[in-house]
Amino acid sequence: MTLPAIDPRRTALLVMDYQGGILDRLGDAEALLSCAADAIAVVRGRGGQIGYVRVAFDDADYDAVPPHSRFASIGPEMHSHSPATAIHDAVAPEPGDITVRKTRVGAFSTTDLDQQLRDRGITTLILAGISTSGVVLSTVRDAADRDYQVLVLADGCADPVPGVHEFLTEKIFPRQASVITGAELKDLLSGSGDVDE
């Protein structure tokens, strides 16, 4: 596929739910962390914005969750002060990065992420996250509805359910997003726009 050249200054890489307590559910996450760290370096090096999204609850958030919500059973391990909710050190935020804390699945839900992106003139989003069927799927849909150009960094996403990641990246996401690899990201940000499918 051929994509339009991407202006790094109007692009943000969203690193979503790269938290210790979530990464632990995947087993071996080294390749995923390496891909995300490389993507962060590429985007940052080209003048793009990095954004971090993490799921974590404070006491008031726990009280506000309705009993029918899937989040009603979340325990203290997901409290905002728990080490399990911290962004992994291998991909840790730096000063000037966007950071938001959410209490639902999608990156835009319960956050001011959209406003922070718009304030910085961001029009293109590159998504990396865990899980593909959770935060990534929800954010692809929401970001497309908000008229962002959306790219999914396939090797920067993972899902604990076998086959789900492949199905979403091959069959569902291409309806609203371009699916790329970490190797293709550098070329896109340099302006060539050519991605072999």
For each feature predicted by the language model, list its residue ranges.
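Active-site-adjacent betaalpha module
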Residues: 1-12, 38-46, 71-197
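Acidic-leg catalytic submotif of subtilisin-like serine proteases
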Residues: 12-18
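Active-site loop/turn elements of alpha/beta-hydrolase fold enzymes
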Residues: 18, 55-57, 155
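Short acidic, Gly/Ser-rich segments with clustered Asp/Glu that frequently serve as metal-coordination loops
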Residues: 19-24
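…and closely analogous acidic/polar surface helices at protein-protein or active-site interfaces
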Residues: 26-43
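Von Willebrand factor
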Residues: 43-62
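Short, flexible, mixed-charge acidic loops at enzyme active sites
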Residues: 63-69
